[in-house]
């Protein structure tokens, strides 16, 4: 059993009681809500005559169903408009802080909370969204929850949870040129499998993560769930504190000093005990692209699509399914695969540093004929910052569309969707069948820089070769 880890410390600090079931009733320090998983939860509260217990610990925004082109109200999609109105009314009714379109603070929930300093070390955080593990980059324990659990947190500010085991994932060394945080997490998921983390919290450690910026760390923690882990985190350090200082909800004055002292104390002890330890060498990682229908089906850009014989027997059935769905033949190079759509954005890679890096490669190039390419900032703040730096002009001159903030093509809940059997190069986090809006649409996951290379060449390319 793990002991002395950040996970243990945060868990213990937020334990209300041990329930008869053996589960822990855990206090939730911050509850993030959006328009998709909250309407039913609020309806259940009304049915029982309940109100939100701690509205000051709840923050709402809209992201999943928001159009990124025409945001005029009412939305063309009547269901989306209905969901918008439901959250607007529920937030007002319960006194919940709500960041609506045009507020200057709206955006993908996992982008806006960190950028405003809402996400802090030592917290427990819950949200009705799979990628809540993003917030673990700050040394928080963050869980994605279902609608009934959203109801529970609204009503009681607690969750009934079983304690997880802790796996330490060490990556050491300097990342080679053209290799990013996205490649690191895709590599980890490839090696450990999409079910490898079931029952675990992942602690990311080692010199590679220590040298990452906060936004890079968020990319890594964001995809913990894709490896089966319920949450993933990185111990807070000076990089964390420097990022937080001065943000809207960060402590100030003496409270800041006290907070930093406490945050440091929550980091895993040097002699912490883990349930499992796995190590990787950063020099073994190259630009990575998924070829199949799970985030675990990734390969380096120099590798061919794997043959069934090269895979463990347990992976062969889904590989056969992937060959058929993706229309890719085993043994053929992934490099050179034609793409139709290129998407940069999402809670994985829609932050300002992602856009800066993508713009660096887009500058002086142009999107290939026949390719639709677009960039979607993760928040209104990111969009304003990008435009202040002139990044939008670089993208527009290169033939990319420049959109409003939202989840966009990460998932098929808004107008940004694939058509027919189009294939996309995407900086998002999931490549499941039909994920991007078409039952036959195909998704290749990669870093924003690699998406630019694909857009420019009209095919999967090595960004290191983009002149």
From Swiss-Prot:
Gene Ontology biological process terms, A to Z:
L-leucine biosynthetic process
Q: Any binding details for the cofactor?
A: Binds 1 [4Fe-4S] cluster per subunit.
An example Pfam family from this entry, by short name, is Aconitase
Does the keyword field hold Transit peptide? Answer: no
Cofactor list: [4Fe-4S] cluster
InterPro entries cross-referenced by the UniProt entry: 3-IsopropMal_deHydase_lsu, Acnase/IPM_dHydase_lsu_aba_1/3, Acoase/IPM_deHydtase_lsu_aba, Aconitase_4Fe-4S_BS, Aconitase_4Fe-4S_dom, IPM_dehydratase_rel_enz, IPMI_cat
* Alphabetic keyword roster: 4Fe-4S, Amino-acid biosynthesis, Branched-chain amino acid biosynthesis, Iron, Iron-sulfur, Leucine biosynthesis, Lyase, Metal-binding
Known catalytic reactions: (2R,3S)-3-isopropylmalate = (2S)-2-isopropylmalate
Residues that, per the record, bind [4Fe-4S] cluster: 347, 407, 410
Q: What is its EC number?
A: 4.2.1.33
Q: Which residues form the signal peptide?
A: none
- Segments crossing the lipid bilayer: none
**Pathway assigned to this chain's UniProt record:** Amino-acid biosynthesis; L-leucine biosynthesis; L-leucine from 3-methyl-2-oxobutanoate: step 2/4
One Gene Ontology MF term: 4 iron, 4 sulfur cluster binding
Q: What does this protein do?
A: Catalyzes the isomerization between 2-isopropylmalate and 3-isopropylmalate, via the formation of 2-isopropylmaleate.
Similarity remark: Belongs to the aconitase/IPM isomerase family. LeuC type 1 subfamily.
* Assembly and binders: Heterodimer of LeuC and LeuD.
Q: What is this protein called?
A: 3-isopropylmalate dehydratase large subunit
Organism listed in the record: Crocosphaera subtropica (strain ATCC 51142 / BH68) (Cyanothece sp. (strain ATCC 51142))
């Amino acid at each position: 059993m793990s002991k002395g880890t950040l996970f243990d410390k945060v868990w213990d600090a937020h334990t209300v009681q041990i329930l008869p079931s053996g589960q822990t009733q855990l206090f939730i320090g911050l509850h993030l809500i959006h328009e998709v998983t909250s309407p039913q939860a609020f309806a259940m509260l009304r049915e029982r005559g309940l109100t939100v217990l701690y509205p000051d610990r709840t923050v709402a925004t809209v992201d999943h169903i928001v159009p990124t082109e025409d945001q005029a109200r009412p939305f063309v999609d009547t269901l989306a408009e209905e969901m918008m109105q439901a959250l607007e009314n529920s937030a007002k009714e319960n006194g919940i802080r709500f960041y609506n379109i045009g507020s200057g603070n709206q955006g993908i929930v996992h982008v806006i909370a960190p950028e405003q300093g809402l996400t802090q070390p030592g917290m427990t955080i819950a949200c009705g969204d799979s990628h809540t593990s993003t917030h673990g980059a700050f040394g928080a324990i963050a869980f994605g929850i279902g609608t009934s659990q959203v109801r529970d947190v609204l009503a009681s500010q607690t969750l009934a949870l079983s304690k997880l085991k802790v796996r330490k994932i060490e990556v050491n060394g300097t990342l080679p040129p053209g290799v990013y945080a996205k490649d690191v997490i895709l590599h980890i998921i490839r090696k450990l499998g999409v079910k490898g983390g079931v029952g675990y919290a992942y602690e990311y450690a080692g010199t590679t993560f220590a040298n990452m910026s906060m936004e890079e760390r968020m990319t890594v923690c964001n995809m913990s769930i894709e490896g089966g882990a319920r949450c993933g985190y990185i111990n807070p350090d000076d990089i964390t504190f420097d990022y937080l200082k001065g943000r809207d909800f960060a402590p100030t004055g003496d409270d800041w000093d006290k907070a930093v002292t406490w945050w440091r104390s929550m980091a895993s002890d040097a002699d912490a005990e883990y349930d499992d330890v796995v190590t990787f060498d950063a020099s073994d990682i190259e630009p990575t692209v998924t070829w199949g229908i799970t985030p675990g089906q990734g390969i380096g850009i120099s590798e061919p699509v794997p043959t069934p014989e090269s895979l463990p027997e347990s992976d062969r059935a889904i590989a056969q399914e992937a060959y058929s769905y993706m229309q890719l033949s085993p043994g053929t190079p992934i490099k050179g695969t034609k793409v139709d759509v290129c998407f940069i954005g999402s809670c994985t890679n829609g932050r300002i540093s992602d856009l800066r890096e993508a713009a660096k490669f887009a500058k002086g190039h142009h999107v290939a004929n026949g390719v639709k390419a677009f960039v979607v900032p993760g928040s209104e703040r990111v969009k304003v910052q990008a435009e202040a730096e002139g990044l939008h002009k670089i993208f527009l001159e290169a033939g990319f569309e420049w959109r409003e903030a939202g989840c966009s093509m990460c998932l098929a809940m808004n107008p940004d969707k694939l058509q027919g059997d189009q294939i996309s190069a995407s900086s998002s986090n999931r490549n499941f069948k039909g994920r991007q809006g078409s039952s036959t649409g195909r998704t290749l996951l990669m870093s924003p820089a690699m998406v630019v290379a694909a857009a420019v060449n009209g095919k999967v390319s090595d960004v290191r070769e983009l002149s």
